[in-house]
Amino acid sequence: MANADVSVTIARPVEDVFAVLTDPTLAPRWAANAIKGELLTPGPPGVGSRRRAVVKGFFGGTMESVMEVTELEPNRTLALRLISASWGGSGRTKYTLTPVPGGTRVDWRWEMEPGGVMKPFDRPLMAVFRRAFQRDVNNLKAMMESNAL
């Protein structure tokens, strides 16, 4: 399984950052490849709740995935595992938020094992994803610090 780790410090309170990260409907506003995000489980997010994401595909088209919350500590941690994905494979992701002077540090880790014909390319793919994820958290930072989110 390959992984990608990215970090950013956002000049906003941890509660604000956590609220954005736990709302999948906001992802298309700050994540470049996100087209749609939605909660599949009624009520506030919690362990066991599920969300669906539609993202831009590698060669055009779209890819869809369903993820389940495996860990949720308010204003601290959000972890999810991949339940199903149109591209196959398995994965999990975790956001860890840390209050720092003047804001919030976000550490984001993705662990993924592509399926099918993509399996041999897991490490090169994660290098591409790492760059994309860093752009996304930088965009999240810019949007949150300008109060666009």
Whereabouts are the PLM-identified features?
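Glycine-rich portal/gate segments that line the openings of hydrophobic small-molecule binding cavities
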Residues: 38-86, 105, 112, 135-149
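Alpha-helix N-cap/helix-start motif
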Residues: 30, 62-63, 90, 118
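Hydrophobic/aromatic beta-strand elements that line small-molecule binding cavities or substrate pockets
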Residues: 6-8, 39, 64-71, 91-99
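Beta-strand/loop substructures that line and gate deep hydrophobic ligand-binding cavities in soluble
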Residues: 81-135, 142
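Amphipathic alpha-helical segments that line or abut small-molecule/effector binding pockets
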Residues: 15-18, 134, 138
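Hydrophobic ligand-binding cavity/cleft-lining segments
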Residues: 1-41, 46-47
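Generic recognition of short, well-ordered alpha-helical interface segments
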Residues: 12, 29, 64, 131-135
